[in-house]
């Protein structure tokens, strides 16, 4: 592993342990050259995914880009970072276990929106506004209407015969 401080390849693992849900290995490392300490995370990757962009271009799937876009939608929201990490891991697992090596950016966006809807309504609306390219206030109203209808649906009492 290359040291992020001096770029030396001579590093040692000092501590290695799984995270709470055992889906990631956290490793504490130290650079032998400059003594810089840093942490790395190791995840299982089920398959190499390629994203088909809207313009038809194909690019490798980037988990970090997914995490950044989710974090942007959650900016200034009080959501536990561990819940965000678990959500992103669940999205990646869903994509990797889908059976396809190529996935459209639209499909990724829809999956992210499903997960954000369960995590935080404001983040869901923020993400939807960028993903669906909102142009007018009525676009926001439509999404807010969907959320309101969804919130009210479980409150309806079941019909008994």
UniProtKB/Swiss-Prot annotation:
UniProt zinc finger (unnamed) residues: 3-34
Family matches, as Pfam families: ATP-cone, Zn_ribbon_NrdR
Cofactor binding comment, as recorded: Binds 1 zinc ion.
Biased composition (Polar residues): 1-11
GO molecular function: ATP binding; DNA binding; zinc ion binding
InterPro entries in the record: ATP-cone_dom, NrdR-like_N, RNR_NrdR-like
A GO BP annotation: negative regulation of DNA-templated transcription
Family matches, as PROSITE patterns: ATP_CONE (PS51161)
ATP-cone domain span: 49-139
Cofactor: Zn(2+)
Coiled-coil zones: none
Keyword line: ATP-binding, DNA-binding, Metal-binding, Nucleotide-binding, Repressor, Transcription, Transcription regulation, Zinc, Zinc-finger
Superkingdom field: Bacteria
Chain residue ranges for the region called Disordered: 1-20
Function text: Negatively regulates transcription of bacterial ribonucleotide reductase nrd genes and operons by binding to NrdR-boxes.
Family to which this protein belongs: Belongs to the NrdR family.
Protein name: Transcriptional repressor NrdR
Species of the source: Bradyrhizobium sp. (strain BTAi1 / ATCC BAA-1182)
